[in-house]
Amino acid sequence: EDCLYLNIYAPAHAETGSKLPVMVWFPGGAFETGSASIFDGSALASYENVLVVTIQYRLGIFGFFNTGDEHARGNWAFMDQVAALVWVQENIEFFGGDPRCVTIFGESAGAISVSSLILSPMTKGLFHKAIMASGVAIIPYLKASDYERNDDLQTIASICDCNASDSVALLQCLRAKSSEELLSISQKTKSFTRVVDGLFFPNELLDLLAQKLFHLVPSIIGVNNHECGFLLPMKEFPEILGGSNKSLALQLIHSVLHIPVQYSYLVADEYFHNKHSLLDIRNRFLDLLGDVFFVVPGLVTAQYHTDAGAPVYFYEFQHRPQCLKDRKPPFVKADHTDEIRFVFGGAFLKGNIVMFEEATEEEKALSRKMMRYWANFARTG
């Protein structure tokens, strides 16, 4: 399947020798969904005089399947991203871009990808700045245990009528299946995520950060002020959105965050102390999720980068888009993904890709400002 491609958006005047800054976008989607084709970089490119490249990489079982040995090491999605960056280095000047001024940026799984590329020795010299929105490589629970991987291998083997005890035989069997069959299997497995493969990741990620074994490039790391306000909990545990008592919150702290029962009460005391209404407890629980998955990992990563001597900027996006007023409950603030439409100038797009309907004049001004900030960083760091 020919699934690896990239799209290039350039100002009308760009030509070989223009040496414009290059911004390479990595789409999000939990490494399960998402596509380069749903993002239109033309507004950002034309307003800010930069080249915008959106790339596709393999997802799910196609992007992360591994057998735990040399026969299928995994991290294929990251290898796709490296290949895209190599292509940019070799070809972007023919579109008016400067291969010595490449900024990688992404949101959610795309930001996790950017953060991972910073940690990999395979990407030396392939980019020069990085922007991570709502995601970094050390987000908890991205790495599956050996038990979970082996359990998923058995599940796959059973569904496909393959032999899971031998990696070579399993791979040969799976390669005989259609992409549609493998895609349906991918939706039944959860453990195929990043692995320390000795190549892309030579060591555990926190060890790489602590030992300063990563690329010291200028970076922007950011979060929204309600990362788990609606989109993510709606997918995983929608029952919480109508309100929560402390019993349900404690149950979810244990089951979702895998915090032992004896410690969950310490967390509850920190977040739910003097909170009694169902709505107050819900709001604090959603704040807790945002802190665990996005805010704290982002701050920890920023501190490691700073300690290593790399320039870091940290932001919090706080605006709830007006176009979502009837699509999300009133209590939701700036939810996960809400900033993307501003960064890409969605309000100014006129093509088939709709990113920002009914933007107010104030939102258009905010979008212009964010595009300018992102592009200025791409130009000068």
From Swiss-Prot:
PROSITE patterns per record: CARBOXYLESTERASE_B_1, CARBOXYLESTERASE_B_2
Gene3D superfamilies noted in UniProt: alpha/beta hydrolase
One of the record's GO molecular function terms: carboxylesterase activity
Glycosylated position list: N163, N245
EC number, UniProt record: 3.1.1.1
Free-text description of this protein's post-translational modifications in UniProt: N-glycosylated.
One Pfam short name: COesterase
Catalytic site positions: S108 (acyl-ester intermediate), E227 (charge relay system), H336 (charge relay system)
Disulfide bonds: C162-C173
Keywords: Disulfide bond, Glycoprotein, Hydrolase, Secreted, Serine esterase
Reaction equation(s) it catalyzes: a carboxylic ester + H2O = an alcohol + a carboxylate + H(+)
Gene Ontology cellular component annotations, sorted alphabetically: extracellular region
Annotated localization: Secreted
Signal sequence region: none
Enzyme class: hydrolase
Tissue: Detected in corpus and cauda epididymal fluid. Present in seminal fluid but not found to be associated with sperm (at protein level). Not expressed in other tissues.
Family classification: Belongs to the type-B carboxylesterase/lipase family.
Protein role: Involved in the detoxification of xenobiotics and in the activation of ester and amide prodrugs.
PANTHER family documented for this protein: CARBOXYLESTERASE
Quaternary structure annotation from Swiss-Prot or TrEMBL: Component of a epididymal complex at least composed of soluble form of prion protein PRNP, CLU, BPI, CES5A, MANBA and GLB1.
Protein name in UniProt: Carboxylesterase 5A
Species of the source: Ovis aries (Sheep)
Gene that encodes the chain: CES5A
